[in-house]
Design a protein with these regions (language model features):
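Charged, alpha-helix-forming regions
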Residues: 1-180
Length: 180
């Protein structure tokens, strides 16, 4: 698949939040994205938008959140918010999820990357296929993601049901009556 590539900084706002981890509240109203896969809660929000959220430290290239709505953001977590109508945010999320870690590792001096900065993120190049193609790709990947999620939640329940069924039939098959 060919197409034009642009720097992320040319089509997106890249910035961080202002929150600290201790700003999290147990019963908060808004998601609070910090530098981990686990999303915390906060009573206040900083942004109301569609964005991709990645840690600036720890889990770099492994942790990606896509979010649409009101949210709070940690001071070392980056938000990537498209400002160009030429790019679908969910398409960008999938593209970054598949390619960003390799990009970061190529830029790094060592095999591990402990932190990234805004200029590094802004130089990441992304393709800009036609919006219809982006929507088609998102639709396909959304279906695969839903299927994967269903399997991850449904499979343990199915395994447990089969285990119980096995135990039932095993006990039935191995129960004998004494005859005189």
């Amino acid at each position: 698949m060919g197409g034009k590539f642009v720097r992320l900084g040319d089509v997106c706002i890249v910035g961080t939040g202002s929150g600290n981890r201790q700003d999290a509240t147990e019963d908060g109203k808004y998601p609070f994205f910090v530098r981990s896969k686990k999303v915390l809660l906060n009573d206040n929000y900083e942004f109301d938008e569609e964005a991709i959220l990645i840690p600036g430290e720890g889990g770099i290239g492994d942790i990606f959140h896509y979010y649409k709505g009101k949210y709070a953001l940690h001071q070392r977590t980056y938000r990537i918010h498209p400002i160009s109508d030429a790019i679908n945010t969910k398409f960008l999320y999938y593209y970054m999820f598949a390619n960003f870690k390799k990009f970061i590792l190529m830029k790094a001096v060592s095999a591990t990357v402990t932190s990234i900065r805004k200029p590094m993120i802004e130089t990441f190049e992304v393709p800009i296929p036609p919006l219809e193609e982006q929507a088609r790709i998102v639709s396909i990947l959304d279906r695969f993601e839903a299927l994967t999620t269903d399997l991850q939640t449904g499979l343990p329940a199915e395994i447990e049901a089969r285990r119980q069924q096995y135990e039932y039939y095993r006990n039935k098959l191995l129960t004998f009556k004494h005859t005189a």
